[in-house]
């Protein structure tokens, strides 16, 4: 459950290490984002040699949340951290590697490139 001012780890090698959610996309009054949702975020911590610099406003897809997600079969899944992958305007990831597990809901949201790069899909 991600909302404005929530800080997320970045799960790719784009150069950013931590981002802060500015806005949840998908409606003017939408407050929370879950796995598979797109957010607008500001880069708070970044590597100096990375593609994405500190202070840049980016779009990102939430791939892991600490708040549990209920699946269709009734099972619950949750992760140890809140994490996102930075994407471009064509919904393709900027980085070439994804770190850590990615939720299956990312596949249902249509981000197949992220799922194929992920080492593990839960």
Swiss-Prot record:
Keyword hit for Ribonucleoprotein: yes
Signal peptide limits: none
BP terms from Gene Ontology: translation
Key words of the record: Ribonucleoprotein, Ribosomal protein, RNA-binding, rRNA-binding
GO molecular function: large ribosomal subunit rRNA binding; structural constituent of ribosome
Database matches in SUPFAM superfamilies: Ribosomal protein L14 (SSF50193)
Cellular component terms per the entry's GO annotation: cytosolic large ribosomal subunit
Disulphide bonds in the chain: none
PANTHER family for the chain: 50S/60S RIBOSOMAL PROTEIN L14/L23, LARGE RIBOSOMAL SUBUNIT PROTEIN UL14M
Job description of the protein: Binds to 23S rRNA. Forms part of two intersubunit bridges in the 70S ribosome.
The family this protein is said to belong to: Belongs to the universal ribosomal protein uL14 family.
Name of the molecule in the record: Large ribosomal subunit protein uL14
Gene name linked to the record: rplN
């Amino acid at each position: 459950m991600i909302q404005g001012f929530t800080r997320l780890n970045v799960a790719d090698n784009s150069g950013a290490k931590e981002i802060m959610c500015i806005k949840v996309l998908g409606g003017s009054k939408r407050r929370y984002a879950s796995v598979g949702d797109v957010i607008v975020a500001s880069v708070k911590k970044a590597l100096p040699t990375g593609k994405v610099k500190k202070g840049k406003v980016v779009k990102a897809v939430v791939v892991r949340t600490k708040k549990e997600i209920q699946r269709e079969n009734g099972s619950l899944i949750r992760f140890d951290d809140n994490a996102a992958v930075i994407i471009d305007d064509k919904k393709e990831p900027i980085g070439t590697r994804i770190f850590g597990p990615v939720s299956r809901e990312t596949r249902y949201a249509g981000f197949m490139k992220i799922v194929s790069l992920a080492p593990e899909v839960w």
